[in-house]
Amino acid sequence: MSHGHSHGGGGCRCAAEREEPPEQRGLAYGLYLRIDLERLQCLNESREGSGRGVFKPWEERTDRSKFVESDADEELLFNIPFTGNVKLKGIIIMGEDDDSHPSEMRLYKNIPQMSFDDTEREPDQTFSLNRDLTGELEYATKISRFSNVYHLSIHISKNFGADTTKVFYIGLRGEWTELRRHEVTICNYEASANPADHRVHQVTPQTHFIS
């Protein structure tokens, strides 16, 4: 079955096709633990703060009491600051079983406070989405473009024809790198970390926060 495609590299696969057993599958989508939720923004959400609720444990993805719906039109823009540097490997987008499900996702890296006007620029990667009602379809990023990310913007630009868009879950898979205390600016954070200077974690819900 076709799972959609991406422009500029990457693709889509079932989470069930991943090598780890089902009980371990949710551990891979632990980057939500590394989001600075207090600073996360969702533009054009109909209910203030609802966009934060879709970044949750993979095991809770089917909880439909938490969702975000767009307001004025079908577009949503998530501005996602991380607490360190991230190597983003894959994304899951779960929606409703109707035309409100997102049909296109555009990714931008390291543009804090991004606005809808900023989405006129070329995205780092664009995906055509299939309907995913169970949180099983992963869209693989082009890792060479997303290996040094401190801020991610997800632009839901289209749905399948409804007036508004609904999203129930966004899963992020990848690795998180701790920033050193004396790092002056994240922008200068080297792409190839020296293991002696940094600790790299495959993020899982069991990982402790570094304060």
Curated annotation (Swiss-Prot):
Reported induction: Up-regulated in K562 and HEL cells undergoing megakaryocyte differentiation induced by phorbol myristate acetate (PMA).
Keyword Transcription: yes
Superkingdom assignment: Eukaryota
Cell compartment(s), UniProt: Cytoplasm
GO cellular component: cytoplasm; nucleus; sperm cytoplasmic droplet
Start and end residues of each PITH domain: 20-192
One of the protein's GO biological processes: penetration of cumulus oophorus
Keywords: Activator, Cytoplasm, Phosphoprotein, Transcription, Transcription regulation
Keyword Plastid attached: no
Modification sites for Phosphotyrosine: 189
Tissue-level expression: Down-regulated in primary acute myeloid leukemia (AML) patients.
Pfam families, A to Z: PITH
Function text: Promotes megakaryocyte differentiation by up-regulating RUNX1 expression. Regulates RUNX1 expression by activating the proximal promoter of the RUNX1 gene and by enhancing the translation activity of an internal ribosome entry site (IRES) element in the RUNX1 gene.
Similarity comment: Belongs to the PITHD1 family.
Listed name of the protein: PITH domain-containing protein 1
Species, as recorded: Homo sapiens
Lineage of producing organism: Eukaryota, Metazoa, Chordata, Craniata, Vertebrata
The gene coding this protein: PITHD1
